[in-house]
Amino acid sequence: EGIVSFLNKVCEVELEPYIESSYQELADYVNAYDQKMIMKRENIADRGIWTAKKRYILNVWDSEGVRYEEAKLKIMGIEAIKTSTPAPCRTMLKDAFKILMSGTEDECIEYIEKCRTEFKSLPPEEVSFPRTASNVEKWHSSSDLYGKGCPIHIRGAILYNHWTKKKEIDHKYATIQNGEKIKFCYLKTPNWMHENVISFIQDFPTELDLDKHVDYDLQFSKAFLDPVKVILDCIGWETERKNTLESFFS
């Protein structure tokens, strides 16, 4: 609290007046009609991790003058806030980032394992990736079902439309149209469909007998582990415990 107050005072008393006077000097130098450049302090944080430009996590104690009793995460450009990430993973990722900011590597590894177990207990609908189906008809092929280079979620949509109709369950499951909000998930191979993806609108078509082939490991890796690993690599942490020669002799 004392450090945050001190930093806030430095900004108000020293930095902001200096920046303001510098902008006024610039305005006078270029003979501006009016000085419109204004800069205010944004966040005071005790920890931060940057993965790239405009991609970062901050442990914020004060945001634009609003003081917090407990630090709040500010997440910019990271997978956790993207709607293309499955909803349960967005929650898991935010909690993982809190551990990254205030916990230990062991606590992080334990949390990842807990998330892995929880993730595998969820139904396909909750672990699948949200997308929008665009150009379904464009990518559809009468000879090979889908054209070369077809995006994976559209390929899943075409396969869904084809097999729900062929299995005569299209009365229960609506056909995926252009612009439809859909979900897709990876499948383990081999399976009877000989494909590694299936899409659906809301309910997973269990009649296709593909739910047992959902690749939970790959889904977890792409939806949760890969985004976390980007952050962990920046601070030198691992996603799992590794046996080393040093630990063998300790």
List each language-model region with its residue ranges.
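DNA-dependent DNA polymerase catalytic subunits
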Residues: 1-250
